[in-house]
Curated annotation (Swiss-Prot):
Domain notes per entry: The N-terminus of helper component proteinase is involved in interaction with stylets. The central part is involved in interaction with virions and the C-terminus is involved in cell-to cell movement of the virus.
Lineage: Viruses, Riboviria, Orthornavirae, Pisuviricota, Stelpaviricetes
This protein's name: P3N-PIPO polyprotein
Gene Ontology annotations for the cellular component aspect, listed alphabetically: host cell plasmodesma
UniProt record similarity statement: Belongs to the potyviridae P3N-PIPO polyprotein family.
Amino acid sequence: MAAIMIGSISVPIIGSAQCATAPIGNRVNIVAPGHMAICKPQMRSHAYYKHASQKLSEQSSRGIEVLNSFFNNDPEDAFRLTRNGMSKVKKGPNGRIILRKPKARHVFERINLEKSEKEQKGKFFNGEYDTTVTSIKGVTTSKENDLGAFSLRSPFYKRTCKKEKRRITRENIVCVDDVNNLCERILKITRDKNIPVEIIGKRRNHHTLTFKKFKGSFVGKVSLAPERSQMKHVEMSYGQFDYILQAICRITSTKHVRDEDIKPGCSGWVFSTDHALTQKYSRLPYLVIRGRDDDGIVNALEPVLFYSDVEHYSFQNEVQFFNGWRKMFDKLKPHSDHTCKVDHNNEECGEMAAVLSQAIFPVLKLSCQVCREKLSRVSFEEFKDFLSRNFMTHESEWSTLRDGVHCDNVLKLIKGAVQTTQNLKLSSDIMKLVQNHTSTHMKQIQDINKALMKGSLVTQDELDLALKQLLEMTQWFKNHMHLTGEEALKTFRNKRSNKAMINPSLLCDNQLDKNGNFIWGERGYHSKRLFKNFFEEVIPSEGYTKYIVRNFPNGTRKLAIGSLIVPLNLDRARTALLGESIEKEPLTSACISQQNENYIHSCCCVTMDDGTPMYSELKSPTKRHLVIGASGDPKYIDLPASEAERMYIAKEGYCYLNIFLAMLVNVNENEAKDFTKMIRDVLIPMLGQWPSLMDVATAAYILGVFHPETRCAELPRILVDHATQTMHVIDSYGSLTVGYHVLKAGTVNHLIQFASNDLQSEMKHYRVGGTPTQRIRLEEQLIKGIFKPKIMMQLLHDDPYILLLGMISPTILVHMYRMRHFERGIEIWIKRDHEIGKIFVILEQLTRKVALAEILVDQLDLISEASPHLLEIMNGCQDNQRAYAPALDLLTIQVEREFSNKELKTNGYPDLHQTLHDMREKNVCEAVTQFMARAKLAGKILCNRAIEAILDFYGKKFDPASKRKKARIFATICSRVLYHDPSTCEEHSRCRRAQTK
C-alpha cells in the first residue's frame, strides 16, 4: 500500500474504490526513529558557496581570456572562427553535414553592426540618450506564450454574454485657441530658422510664407499671383487665411514701416489691424501689399477690376530673368583656376549676354514662343543660313562692338561655322579636270573637292572620308617623289677611309733628311711672309693659359695647348685625355652636299657604319709642327728650320692659313716666293678675317691654277660646327672641345669642289668665324661706301646684294637714293642679270615711299611690306656673292617678324619693339654722321665748287634782290646734293654768306 511520509508520520493512500469499504479507525502509523531518514544540518555557510562560485567563475574567465588571446594574436584564425560562428549548418551531397559560410563582406558588415549595437547599448545604459518615452510596445515573452496554452477553466465555466453599449455620436469640436496657438508656435520656428511655409487653402489657393528682415525687425511676406506671371482680381482670400494672417501679425513687428518705405519688391507684406497703413488703405482687418494705384496702396485681399490701373510691387521682370539666368549659369559654369572678382558693371555684362544670345539664337523676343518654334522647326542647313544672313544684316553693329565685350573668338567661331564656300568656280574647275577619270587618285581628289565645296556644312563622315583619301594620296606621293629630306639621310653612309693618303712630296728621298723629316729649303725661308704677319708667337715661359680659349664671333673653342705641360702622375695624365663635349648635333641635310642630284661624299660629314655622324675626339697638341692628314693617322711635319725654335699660332680669323701652309709643302722651291707673295698680297686682303668656306675654296682654286702641284696636297683636319655654322681648321695645338662633325675632304681637290655654284650645300656658306659679325662688317662697308663713290662702284660690281642690307634703316635707304646709287646699280645690272636689276628698281620705289613718310613706324611698315617680294626674287638669284646669305637672312627675319606681329596685333597684343627700332635708328644715324665726318677734303672741295657753280647758274635766272627765294633754291639744291640736311650743314651758312655778298 502506498503511503505518504510527513515527518515521522506515515499516511497510507487508499484508492477511491476502497474508501467505501474501509473500516473507520486510526489510519496513521507512527514510524520508529530508527526507520526515519537522518537530516544532517548544513555546516557550510553562504559565504563559502559565494567564494567557491567566484573562484570557479574566475577560472572560467581566465581560461576564456587565454583562449581569446591565443586566437586574437592571429587575425586569420580569429576571422575564421567568427565566420564559422556565423555559418549555417547545411546537409551537403552524400549526406555530409557542411557549413555554409557567408561572404567576407557580410561578415565584416555583421561585425560592424554588432559593434555599433554594443556601443548604442552602452550609451543607453550610461544615460546618454533622452529619457523621454515616445512609445511603448507590448512584448510577449516565451513564458507568457507557454502559459497561454494552459487553461484555468473549471468544468462549471460558463461564458457570459457581452452587453452592447450604446454609442453616442459626438461632434468633433476643435478649440480655436489651440489652433491659433499651434500656428503661432510653428510660425515662430520658421521665422527663426528662415524656413518657407506653404499655406494651402481650398481649390488652388495656396501661398508661400516667408519672413524678411526690415530695419531690424521681421515682416511677413506671402507670395502672390503676379510673382508667377499671373493676374487675379483677388490675389488672396481673406476668408480662407484670416487665422494665418492673425498669427503672422502676432509674431511680426511692422510699426516702423512707413508709407514711403513701400516700394517695388514689397509685394505680399502683411500688416496688422492697428497699423496706420491698414487703417488708411484697407477695409478689411489686415493689409497685404499688392501695389499702388492713383488712390494709394492696393490691398491684395480686396478685389481689383482693372489690372492696368495697378502698379504691382511684385518682383520685377529683370529680377525674374536674373533668377533664371543665375540658376542655369551656375549649373554650366566651368572649373575655375582663379578667384573671380567684379571687374565689369551690369551694363557691360548685359551687353555680352545679348551679343552671345543674338549670335547663336537670334529672335525678336526670348519670351515669344513663336520665335522659338520658328528656329526649332527649320533644318540644320537652314538654321546656318539664317545665322549667316543675320551676321550680314548686322555687319556694322558687329564691327562697332567695343573692346570690353571680349567676344572676338566666339564671333569668329560662329562666323566660321556658318560660312559657306563662296568661291565655287575653283571647285568647278577641279571637277572639270577630274571628271570622267576612273583612276584611284582622281577619285580621291573628287572626294576631297566635295568636302571642301560644302565648307562648314560638311558632315563628320564626309570629312573623315576626305582625310582618309588625302592620307592615301600623301602616302602615294611620298613613295614616288624624290626624297631629299631626312628620309634620304636614313640610307646615307659616308665612312672614313682607314688608309692614309699618299703624298708624293713626303715620299721623295731628295726632300727628306737622314731622320726622314721633310726639308723645307727655300719654302721655309719664304714662309716668313706668313708667320710674321698673320701668326702670333707663343712664348712658353709666359704660360699657355691665354691661348686656351679660341674666340670666334659665334662662340668659343678650347685648344688643347694646355696639355703641352705633361703631368708625371698617371691619374692626372689620364685626366688630360678627357675633352669637353659640346651639344652633339644629329645628321641633318646640312651635313651633306649634292650636285646633279648625287652626293659629293668628299664634301659631306663623315658617318659611322650605322649612319650616325662621326664626332670629333680629343686632338692632342704638339710643339713646332704642321699637322696634315684628314684620314688615317695624322702626319707631323716640322716647321721650317728658321722657325724651328719658335712656336706660332694663327691670329683670330686667319686659321685658314694652315691650309695654305699645307699647300706650301707641295710647292716647288723655285716657285715658293711667288706662292707666298700671292697669298700675302692678293688672297689674304681678299679673304680677310673669317671668310666663308666657299671663298677659301675659291682661293685654293686660284692657287691651284698657278701651282698645279698643290692640288694633291693634303689638308689639315677640318671640324664642322653646325650650331654656329663654323669650320674649325685644326692646327698642331689640337682641340680640347669635342663633339664636332668631321669633314671628309682630305685634299685640295676635294676642297675646291666647295667653290662650285652648282654644289648644293649649306656648309659652303659656313664661316671660319660667324655670319653676324660678317653682316655688321658689310653694313659698315655699305655706310662707308655711300659717301665714297669709288668704293660704292666697286661694291656694285662685285657684291650688289650688299645694298639690300640698307633695309635695316630708312636713313641708309634715303641717303643711297639721294646719292643715286640705285640708278647706277640699275644701269650696271639691268643687262648682266635681270633679277638683280629688278631688286634695285624695287629698292628705288620703296625709298620714294619711305621718304614721303614722316614717322619711323610708317617707314618700317613700308620696308616690311616690300620684304616678301624681295625675298621671292632673292630665292631665284645666284648665291655666289658674299652678301647674299646676310641679305637673305635679313629679309627672312623681316618677313617672319611681320607675320608674327600681325598675328599678335590681331589677337590684341601690342608690339613692344618700338623702343628697339628707335635706338637702332639712332645708332645708324650716328654711324652715318661719323662716316660723313671722315669724308676726304678733296671731296668736300669738289662738292662746294659744284654747289657754287649751280648757284651761279640758277642765281641768274631769278631776281637777285629776292633773298628768300635764293635761300629756298639753295636749300632745295643742297637737299639733292649734300650729305647733310640743309638745316644742319656747316657749309650752308658759308654759302649763304657768299651768295649775299
